[in-house]
Curated annotation (Swiss-Prot):
Record motif 'KMSKS' region, residues: 560-564
Keywords: Aminoacyl-tRNA synthetase, ATP-binding, Coiled coil, Cytoplasm, Ligase, Nucleotide-binding, Protein biosynthesis
Function: Catalyzes the attachment of valine to tRNA(Val). As ValRS can inadvertently accommodate and process structurally similar amino acids such as threonine, to avoid such errors, it has a 'posttransfer' editing activity that hydrolyzes mischarged Thr-tRNA(Val) in a tRNA-dependent manner.
Domain of life: Bacteria
Domain notes for this protein: ValRS has two distinct active sites: one for aminoacylation and one for editing. The misactivated threonine is translocated from the active site to the editing site.
UniProt-recorded name of the protein: Valine--tRNA ligase
Annotated InterPro entries: aa-tRNA-synth_I_CS, aa-tRNA-synth_Ia, Anticodon_Ia_Val, M/V/L/I-tRNA-synth_anticd-bd, Rossmann-like_a/b/a_fold, tRNA-bd_arm, tRNAsynth_Ia_anticodon-bd, Val-tRNA_synth_C_sf
Subcellular location: Cytoplasm
GO cellular component: cytosol
Organism, as annotated: Pasteurella multocida (strain Pm70)
Length: 954
C-alpha cells in the first residue's frame, strides 16, 4: 500500500535537470568502464566551432548521438563519446577581428600576430566554455575529462606528424596553382566557403583581330569572343573553339592579336568549349579561371596573372609556365592606364576602350552565378598563389574501396553516390591558409629560399646539419581547418602513440553529420585515418563503421536558419523559455546588417507574441528524435514541441497515479494476472522490439513513435483505465496482479525511454525502484529492456483488442447520440464468434465498467432487438437500445454516413476485381481475400440498411 508516498503534482524540468546532470557528472557515470573485456562502443562528436554557441542543428545531431551512447551503455558496452571543439581558423579569426574592431577600434595588425593570437585564445576559453555548458544542458552523457580542442598540444603534435610524414612520402608539396582567393581577407579559401550567388550580369562580345591576314569562313578578319569577365582579358593566353565547330576549323593553329595588350595569342581547339555559348569562341585566361586553368594545362599555355592580392590590376604581369614555375621567355605587358585599377573599375575602362576602338560587338544581358567568399562577403578571385597541397589521389583510392567493400556504410545509402562522385574526380587539396589563427605549417626557409620540413626547428637543424647561426624563418601560413579535423577520430585517442584508448575505441562506430560536409570532412577523415592508422595485422582502419547523414533543421516555413534572417532558434530558449523582449534583443542586437532589424522584430513578434515558454530538455530531445526522418531536411515545429511537453506531463501523471494509488497492493501472497495484465506485457514487448529494430536502422523517428504510441495510447489511455475497476473491486490476488504489472511495466518503460528522455526517466525511476525491488544508483546503468518472445500473448492481445473496439464503439454511440456518460446503457450483442464469446465472458465486468453499461446481453438466435443504434466490430453486431435516448434525425445521419462508407469499400473492391491486370497478376489467395472482404462489407451494409429502415419507421 502507498498511502504515505508523495509525488509532486507536475514535472518541473528546471527544478531537476541541472542538479541531476551535476550528480551524473560528479558520479562518473559518463566515463567508459574500466572493464576492458566488455565490447566497446564509441562515437567522436563532430567538433563544434568555437565561433559562438550551439544552434539547433548541433542539438539535433547531438541528441541522436546521445541516444546511441545511452542505449549502448545500458546494453553493457564500454562506451566513449569523445567530445571537443574545433579552432575553425578563418571563422574564429573573423569573429575576434570584428570584436576588437567594434569594442576597441583596432585591427589585428595593431596587435601583431602573437598578441592577437592571445586574444583568440581568450575568446576560445569563453566560447568553448559556453558550448560545453550548452552540451551539458542538452543532457549529453560525455566524459568531460576527455574533452579535446583541435589546437591542444597533443592534437597539434598529431598534425605535425601527419604533415611531415606525408611530405616525406611525396604526398605534400608546395606549388603555384589556382585557388579561391578572398581579396578582402587575403587568404585562400575552400570550395565550402564559396557561395555562388545568382546575379544579373552581361555577356560582352569583343572582336579579337585575326593576325597575319587570316579570315573567317565568312570573310571576317576578326573573331568575336564572348566573356562575362572583361577585366581578366589582359591575362588571355589563347582563344578556344570546339574542334568539331566547322565555322572555325580552318583557323585552329592560327593566332589573334589581343586588343589593348597587342600580343599574339593562339587559336586552340578544346572539347571544353560549348558551341552554343555566345559565339562559340571563348578567351582562355589560365591564371584567372578554373576551367581555363585546366585548358591551359592541357595545351601547356603560359599563365599570365594580372591581379594583385587585393584584386587590383598589377603594374607588371606575373608569368608562370604550365609547370608552375616562373616563365622568363614570355612577355605580357600591362598598359599603364590600367595599372593599379580596382578590378571592377578596370572592367568598365576596358569595355569603354573596346568600344572606342570599334571592337565592342554587342552586350547581352546574362544571368550568371558569381562566387562570393561566405565570410569576406566579396566576389572571390581565382588567383595563382604559392600554396601547400596534398596529393590526394593515392589516399582516395583506398577510401573509395572501403565504402565499395562495405567497411563503411552510409545511411541513407544514396549518400554513397555523392561520396563516390567527388572521390573519383578528386583534385589535389590546397591546405595552406593566409591566416594567423591555426596550426602553423611546420616548414622553415633559409635566406636562399630553401624549404625544410620537420616537426620543429631543432629537428630541421639536426636533420639537415644546419649551423646554429643560419637564420631560419617558419612559414607564416596556417593549415586549412579541415586538415586537423580530418585526424579527429584518432588524434583525440592519443595517436601517434599507440595508446590503450586507441586500441579500445578505434574504429569508432558511427559518425552523425550533415550532408554538406561529406566532401570536406567525412572523406578526408576516411583518407587520413586509413593512411595512418592500421590494426595489429597492418590493415588500414576506417575512422567509423557507419556514417548517418542528417538533413538540415529549417524554420517552420522551411527557410534555412541564419542570423541575417533572424530565424535562428537557440535550443536553450526551447528548454528554459525566454520572454519576448529578451528574444528580440537576441535576434536584433549586434547585427552585421542592422537595416534588417525592424523586419526581423516584426516576424519574431508574429511567431512568438508571448515569447517562448519553458519546455524542458526532454521535450526538446523527444521532438528532435520524432522529427529525425532519414536524410530529409526538417522543418521545426513548435506545436510538436508543445505536444511532447504534454507527453512528458502524461508520463509523470501516469507514474504519479500508479505510485500514489492507495489501492496498490504489492504484498506477498497469491497473484492472479488478468487478460489486461498479460496484454500490456505483450504490448510492451512489441514496443521493445519496434524500438530496437528502429534504432538498429537509425530510424530515430520510429523509436519516438513506438514510445509515444505505447505510453500514451496503450499504457495511459487503456491499461491504467483497465486496472481501476480491478484495484477497486477485484479479488486480493487480482489486485496484486494488477499492482505488480503496473509497477513492472512502468519501471521497464522508464528504462526503454531513458536514452531519449534522460531527465524525467531518472527522476521517476528513483521513485519507482523501491516498489519494483530494483537497486542501483542511476537508471543509465540499468539494463536496457530485451525483447522476450515468450512474453508475447496472442490470445490476450486478441481479447483486449476486441474489447477495446467494443468500448470505443459504445463510446462513439454515446457521443453521436449526445448521451452523457452519467446515463447507463444496455448493450446487446449478436452474431458473436466463439473467440468473441470468450473475450466477452473473460472481460464482461471490465467492459461494463469502461463503457459505463448497466447490462450486457447476447441475443438468442432469431431474437428481435428493440429499436437500437448498431455498430459492427468485425462480424459482431453491437446494439444499444435507444428508448428514451435517440435523436432520430442525428441517428439517421450517422447511419447514412456508415452506409456510404461501406458502399465505398464495396465499390473499391469491385473496381479492383474488375481490373484485368490486377486479376492476372495477383495470387489466387489475394483475390479470394478481396472477395471475402467484399462479402463481409455486403453483409454489414445489409444490417445497416435494416437499422436505417427501423429508425426511419419511428
Amino acid at each position: 500500500m502507498t498511502q504515505n508516498f508523495e509525488m509532486a503534482d507536475r514535472f518541473t524540468p528546471s527544478a531537476v535537470e541541472q542538479a541531476l546532470y551535476k550528480h551524473w557528472e560528479e558520479s562518473g557515470y559518463f566515463k567508459p568502464s574500466e572493464d576492458t573485456s566488455k565490447p566497446s562502443y564509441s562515437i567522436a562528436i563532430p567538433p563544434p566551432n568555437v565561433t559562438g554557441s550551439l544552434h539547433m542543428g548541433h542539438a539535433f545531431q547531438q541528441t541522436l548521438m546521445d541516444i546511441l551512447i545511452r542505449f549502448n551503455r545500458m546494453e553493457g558496452h564500454n562506451t566513449l563519446w569523445q567530445t571537443g571543439t574545433d579552432h575553425a581558423g578563418i571563422a574564429t579569426q573573423m569573429v575576434v577581428e570584428r570584436k576588437i574592431a567594434a569594442e576597441e577600434g583596432k585591427t589585428r595588425h595593431d596587435y601583431g600576430r602573437e598578441a592577437f593570437i592571445d586574444k583568440i585564445w581568450d575568446w576560445k576559453a569563453y566560447s568553448g566554455g559556453t558550448i560545453s555548458q550548452q552540451m551539458r544542458r542538452l543532457g549529453n552523457s560525455i566524459d568531460w575529462e576527455r574533452e579535446r580542442f583541435t589546437m591542444d598540444e597533443g592534437l597539434s603534435d598529431a598534425v605535425k606528424e601527419v604533415f611531415v610524414r606525408l611530405h616525406e612520402e611525396g604526398l605534400i608539396y608546395r606549388g603555384k596553382r589556382l585557388v579561391n582567393w578572398d581579396p578582402k581577407l587575403h587568404t585562400a579559401i575552400s570550395d565550402l566557403e564559396v557561395e555562388n550567388k545568382e546575379s544579373k550580369g552581361s555577356l560582352w562580345h569583343f572582336r579579337y583581330p585575326l593576325a597575319n591576314g587570316a579570315k573567317t569562313a565568312d570573310g571576317k578578319d576578326y573573331l568575336v569572343v564572348a566573356t562575362t569577365r572583361p577585366e581578366t582579358m589582359l591575362g588571355d593566353t589563347a582563344v578556344a573553339v570546339h574542334p568539331e565547330d566547322e565555322r572555325y576549323q580552318s583557323l585552329i593553329g592560327k593566332t589573334v592579336v589581343l586588343p589593348l595588350a597587342n600580343r599574339e595569342i593562339p587559336i586552340i581547339a578544346d572539347d571544353y568549349v560549348d558551341r552554343e555559348f555566345g559565339t562559340g569562341v571563348v578567351k582562355i585566361t589560365p591564371a584567372h579561371d578554373f576551367n581555363d586553368y585546366e585548358v591551359g594545362k592541357r595545351h601547356q599555355l603560359p599563365m599570365v596573372n594580372v591581379m594583385t592580392l587585393n584584386a587590383d590590376i598589377r603594374a607588371e604581369a606575373e608569368i608562370i609556365g604550365s609547370d608552375g614555375k616562373i616563365l622568363e621567355s614570355y612577355t605580357a605587358l600591362i598598359p599603364t592606364k590600367y595599372q593599379g585599377m580596382e578590378r571592377f573599375a578596370a572592367r568598365k575602362q576596358i569595355v569603354a576602350d573596346f568600344e572606342e576602338l570599334g571592337l565592342l560587338d554587342e552586350i547581352k544581358p546574362h544571368d550568371l552565378k558569381v562566387p562570393y567568399g561566405d565570410r569576406g562577403g566579396v566576389p572571390i578571385e581565382p588567383m595563382l598563389t604559392d600554396q601547400w597541397y596534398v596529393s590526394v589521389k593515392p589516399l582516395a583510392e583506398v577510401a573509395v574501396k572501403a565504402v565499395e567493400d562495405g567497411e563503411i556504410q552510409f545511411v541513407p545509402k544514396q549518400y554513397e553516390n555523392l561520396y563516390f562522385s567527388w572521390m573519383r574526380d578528386i583534385q589535389d587539396w590546397c591546405i595552406s591558409r593566409q591566416l594567423w589563427w591555426g596550426h602553423r605549417i611546420p616548414a622553415w626557409y633559409d635566406e636562399q629560399g630553401n624549404v625544410y620540413v620537420a616537426r620543429d626547428e631543432a629537428e630541421v637543424r639536426a636533420k639537415h646539419n644546419l649551423p646554429a647561426d643560419l637564420a631560419l624563418k617558419q612559414d607564416e601560413d596556417v593549415l586549412d581547418t579541415w586538415f586537423s579535423s580530418g585526424l579527429w577520430t584518432f588524434s583525440t585517442l592519443g595517436w601517434p602513440k599507440q595508446t590503450p584508448d586507441l586500441k579500445m575505441f578505434h574504429s569508432t562506430d558511427v559518425l552523425i553529420t550533415g550532408f554538406d560536409i561529406i566532401f570536406f570532412w567525412v572523406a578526408r577523415m576516411i583518407m587520413f585515418t586509413m593512411h595512418f592508422v592500421k590494426d595489429e595485422n597492418g590493415k588500414p582502419q576506417v575512422p567509423f563503421k557507419t556514417v548517418y547523414v542528417t538533413g538540415l533543421i529549417r524554420d517552420e516555413q522551411g527557410q534555412k536558419m541564419s542570423k541575417s534572417k533572424g530565424n535562428v532558434i537557440d535550443p536553450l530558449d526551447m528548454i528554459d523559455g525566454i520572454d519576448l523582449e529578451s528574444l528580440l534583443e537576441k535576434r536584433t542586437g549586434n547585427m552585421m546588417q542592422p537595416q534588417l532589424a525592424e523586419k526581423i522584430a516584426k516576424a519574431t513578434i508574429k511567431a512568438f507574441p508571448e515569447g517562448i515558454a519553458e519546455h524542458g530538455t526532454d521535450a526538446l530531445r523527444f521532438t528532435l528524435t520524432a522529427l529525425a526522418t532519414n536524410g530529409r531536411d526538417i522543418n521545426w515545429d513548435m506545436k510538436r514541441l508543445e505536444g511532447y511537453r504534454n507527453f512528458c506531463n502524461k508520463l509523470w501523471n501516469a507514474s504519479r497515479f500508479v505510485l500514489t494509488n492507495d489501492k496498490l497492493d504489492l504484498s506477498e501472497g497469491s497473484v492472479e494476472y488478468s487478460v489486461a495484465d498479460r496484454w500490456i506485457q505483450s504490448e510492451f514487448n512489441r514496443t521493445v522490439e519496434a524500438f530496437r529494430n528502429a534504432l538498429a536502422q537509425f530510424r530515430f523517428d520510429l523509436c519516438a513513435t513506438a514510445l509515444y504510441e505505447f505510453t500514451w495510447n496503450q499504457f495511459c489511455d487503456w491499461y491504467l483505465e483497465l486496472t481501476k475497476p480491478v484495484l477497486v473491486n477485484g479479488s486480493v490476488a487480482q489486485k496484486r496482479g494488477a499492482s505488480q504489472t503496473l509497477i513492472n511495466v512502468l519501471e521497464k518503460l522508464l528504462r526503454l525511454t531513458h536514452p531519449v528522455m534522460p531527465f524525467i526517466t531518472e527522476e521517476i525511476w528513483h521513485k519507482v525502484k523501491a516498489f519494483a525491488g530494483v537497486s542501483g544508483d542511476t537508471i543509465m546503468l540499468q539494463a536496457f529492456p530485451q525483447f522476450e518472445q515468450s512474453a508475447l500473448d496472442y490470445q490476450a492481445e486478441a481479447e483486449i483488442n476486441w474489447m477495446k473496439e467494443v468500448i470505443v464503439a459504445v463510446r462513439n454511440i454515446r457521443a453521436e447520440s449526445n448521451i452523457p456518460p452519467s446515463k447507463g446503457l444496455d448493450l446487446l450483442l449478436r452474431n458473436l464468434s466463439e473467440a468473441d464469446q470468450n473475450a466477452l465472458e473473460n472481460n464482461r465486468t471490465l467492459i461494463q465498467a469502461m463503457a459505463k453499461l448497466d447490462a450486457i446481453r447476447v441475443l438468442e438466435a432469431g431474437e428481435d432487438a428493440p429499436l437500437s443504434v448498431a455498430k459492427l466490430v468485425n462480424n459482431a453486431e453491437l446494439l444499444v437500445p435507444m428508448a428514451g435516448f435517440i435523436n432520430k434525425e442525428a441517428e439517421l445521419a450517422r447511419l447514412n454516413k456508415e452506409i456510404e462508407k461501406y458502399q465505398g469499400e464495396i465499390q473499391r473492391i469491385e473496381n479492383k476485381l474488375a481490373n484485368e491486370a490486377f486479376v492476372a497478376k495477383a495470387p489466387p489467395a489475394v483475390i479470394e481475400k478481396e472477395r471475402a472482404k467484399m462479402a463481409e462489407y455486403a453483409e454489414g451494409l445489409n444490417k445497416l440498411k435494416q437499422q436505417y429502415l427501423a429508425i426511419e419507421a419511428l
